[in-house]
């Protein structure tokens, strides 16, 4: 992998209220351990506990009437999204503050558990790349969560089914979104104590503010990670098709590396412009609908350009070498063996490297185009000729035997790491 795999350990942030930390751990464990249809109903006293302790969690209790007024009685014109556990409305408080209100589905017990986990998690966890919780409503049978309003919607809204006139995201914006999401995940994994497994990372759960700054949302499936003497958390498999790590989908064993796999899928979506579970219309014959299965052989065979989103290719503004590096990072995260995947801190450093070099390339290209250029014989070249030559140089590298062999070495390194971890040996340092 590239030299940016070096990273600095993150500072831990402990959840100071230990009694409530245990309470949340119990709530998150109970939210998934029971098989569907047999889970014990969460009684209203659990929700009342949240209400009574709201001052300790720095969030506001809203009345149902207050939120109904804010959302114009939850009418369709206020509707901004639907999810697996509820419907989201845009609202405006009497203070003028814009908000997003998620009304949890009353038809299932799981919705009440989701409510408890989400409110408690977001009350304790605060980071610039996590959505901010304003408060909640637990009045009667109503369960509503109130967030900051994110004006640009989700990443999913900017990748698929674009409206007429809607611009596709450029390379730098896509990589900045990936970096912000990775930083949010790094906070959950490295700074929260105990670590938090997000468990529901996908493009529809990454929201964007007016500057395309991403924030992770929807924490109803989040769980505390394993304690020091355990390698994983065993739980009922939940999540979205196309994003679940294979070891979690097959065995229910959940680790921080399960989130890394999901992040790899998101990064691959950002680069390819394809859904994690592709429509059958995009598949040929018996081809798998899973994006990962579609893209992996293309990556291994050096057919990088077939992976990239055509809209991204048309916009330009990126280097073929950096595109190749981005896909490398995605497939490191998508290693079949959990122990072969990088940590989220390593992923953050890799993405910083890619963005830094993207910005440098922009500046270098601008200087060359504005200042003109000359070939080796001293003959001036036009801006178009200069750009064409730069693209040819990059293409020569990406399709070279060296680059193809490098891809195979990355896969071999991942397998070596996984094998040695299974045997309890110390794995070697990844190839730089």
Swiss-Prot record:
Per its UniProt record, what PROSITE patterns does this chain match? PROTEIN_KINASE_ATP (PS00107), PROTEIN_KINASE_DOM (PS50011), PROTEIN_KINASE_ST (PS00108)
The EC code for this enzyme is 2.7.11.1
Phosphothreonine PTM sites in chain numbering = 235, 240
Q: Which UniProt keywords apply?
A: ATP-binding, Brassinosteroid signaling pathway, Cell membrane, Kinase, Lipoprotein, Membrane, Nucleotide-binding, Palmitate, Phosphoprotein, Receptor, Serine/threonine-protein kinase, Transferase
Instruction: State the top-level EC class.
Output: transferase
* Modified residue annotations for Phosphoserine: 44, 47, 204, 234
**Looking at the Swiss-Prot or TrEMBL record, what is one Pfam family this protein matches?**
Pkinase
What is a single molecular function from GO for this protein?
protein serine/threonine kinase activity
Which family, according to UniProt?
Belongs to the protein kinase superfamily. Ser/Thr protein kinase family.
Q: What is this protein called?
A: Serine/threonine-protein kinase CDG1
Organism listed in the record:
Arabidopsis thaliana (Mouse-ear cress)
Gene behind the chain? CDG1
């Amino acid at each position: 992998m590239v030299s940016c795999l070096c990273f600095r350990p993150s500072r831990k942030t402990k959840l100071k209220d230990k009694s409530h930390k245990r309470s949340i751990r119990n709530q998150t464990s109970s939210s998934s351990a029971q098989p569907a249809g047999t889970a014990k109903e969460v009684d209203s006293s659990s929700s009342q506990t949240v209400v009574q302790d709201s001052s300790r969690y720095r969030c506001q209790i809203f009345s149902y009437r207050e939120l109904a007024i804010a959302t114009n009685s939850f009418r369709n014109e206020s509707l901004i999204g639907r999810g697996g556990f509820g419907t989201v409305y845009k609202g405006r408080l009497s203070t003028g503050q814009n908000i997003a209100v998620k009304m949890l589905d009353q038809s299932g017990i799981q919705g009440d558990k989701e409510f408890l986990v989400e409110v408690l998690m977001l009350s304790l966890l605060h980071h610039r790349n996590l959505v901010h919780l304003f408060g909640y409503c637990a009045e009667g049978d109503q369960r509503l969560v109130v967030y900051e309003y994110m004006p640009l919607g989700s990443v999913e809204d900017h990748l698929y089914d674009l409206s007429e006139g809607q611009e596709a995201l450029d390379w730098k914006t896509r990589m900045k979104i990936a970096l912000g999401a990775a930083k949010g995940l790094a906070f959950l994994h490295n700074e929260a104590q105990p670590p938090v497994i997000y468990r529901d990372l996908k493009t529809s759960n990454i929201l964007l503010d007016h500057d395309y700054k991403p924030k992770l949302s929807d924490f109803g499936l989040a769980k505390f990670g394993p304690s020091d003497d355990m390698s994983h958390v065993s739980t009922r498999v939940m999540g979205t098709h196309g994003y679940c790590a294979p070891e979690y989908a097959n065995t229910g064993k959940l680790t921080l590396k399960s989130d890394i796999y999901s992040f790899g899928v998101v990064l691959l979506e950002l680069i390819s412009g394809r859904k994690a579970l592709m429509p059958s219309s995009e598949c040929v014959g018996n081809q798998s609908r899973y994006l990962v299965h579609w893209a992996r052989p293309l990556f291994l065979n050096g057919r990088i350009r077939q992976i990239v989103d055509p809209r991204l290719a048309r916009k330009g503004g990126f280097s073929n070498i950096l595109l190749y590096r981005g896909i490398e990072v995605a497939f490191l995260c998508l290693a079949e063996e959990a122990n072969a995947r990088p940590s989220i801190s390593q992923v953050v450093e890799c993405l910083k490297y890619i963005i830094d070099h993207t910005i440098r390339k922009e500046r270098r290209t601008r200087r060359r185009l504005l200042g003109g250029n000359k070939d080796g014989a001293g003959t001036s070249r036009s801006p178009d000729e200069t750009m064409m030559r730069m693209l040819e140089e990059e293409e020569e590298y990406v399709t070279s035997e060296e680059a193809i062999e490098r891809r195979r070495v990355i896969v071999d390194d991942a397998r070596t790491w996984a094998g040695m971890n299974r045997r309890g040996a110390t794995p070697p340092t990844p190839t730089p």
